[in-house]
Amino acid sequence: LLVFYLNSQFVLAQERFEPIKVSEDNFIIDGLLDEEAWQNETLVTIENEISPGNNTAARVETRGLITYTDTHLFIGFHALDNPKNIRASIRPRDNFSLWSDDVVLVRLDPYADGRNNYIIVVNPLGSHFDVRSVNAIEEDDRYDISFNMEFETAGQLVSDGYQVEIKIPFSSLPFPNGKDQLWHFNFFRKYFDNGNEIELSSQTFDRDNSCEVCQTTDQLVLKDIVIEKRFELLPYIAGNFSGKRAQAQAPFDFDKLNPNAGLGVNLDLNKTSTLEITMNPDFSQVEADVTQIDINSSYALEYPERRPFLIEEPMWLILLMVLSILVQSIIP
């Protein structure tokens, strides 16, 4: 009886949202929710304070809006507050110091299975980062920061707070095959009150449940969407040569140019299967524009993994490496 009661509470916590599909011509992503298409769209209120309050009523108003077209999901936020209290700076993408700003956040679980959340975080000026969240025991294992998807954001301060717009192509997200979709999602907001960090959610949050991704359960119904298959061609060409001086004042004597080239292909067979081929991949690629300071460090600097072939599904690569080692051990 107790188990049935708890399950009933879980089911009742779900809400179902069925936004109306609109024309993409009605949207300009400028950070202002002034387009006519937003006026009658599905409203999602962020009314639960989950920290420091424990599912208490939010003390500020936050409106989330959601709609979609054949090929894109559109999300809007209107976060009400005194503009003087809002913290925001223009930051590069995937700069996690963004978390020290006021932010709004959307979690998407396209498979509705509580295994993955695809998260987009945006501050009042439109700066953003994205991350994939999984169910893991250790905090450091819960977030895959190498995950990147295509999307567009914009944000602006307004007289009663700030507004944010997000445009997400369906082609950038994994989800089950089919034109009609049932996803799980929720919205989140973080702001500051007298220096204290306040967190709000569109759903209640169970602190005793260690599975955060399992608590993204509001239902989002999408009908008759267009599934665009992704095709990416990633060629590269590089070369190097070296030289030396025979004597201190002599000119450099250079060797011949050593050219190198390779190709990567990424093709969606359908929404659940992807064919990825690489020939002579450029394993020297790193995100070298990441700012890091090295002063008398006893360890080398590390850069985040950005090579497409290695971040699509790293677990498959680990499995292949393990199988390769086993085969070599069995068949010397």
Show the residue positions of the predicted features.
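Bacterial Sec-dependent N-terminal signal peptides
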Residues: 1-17
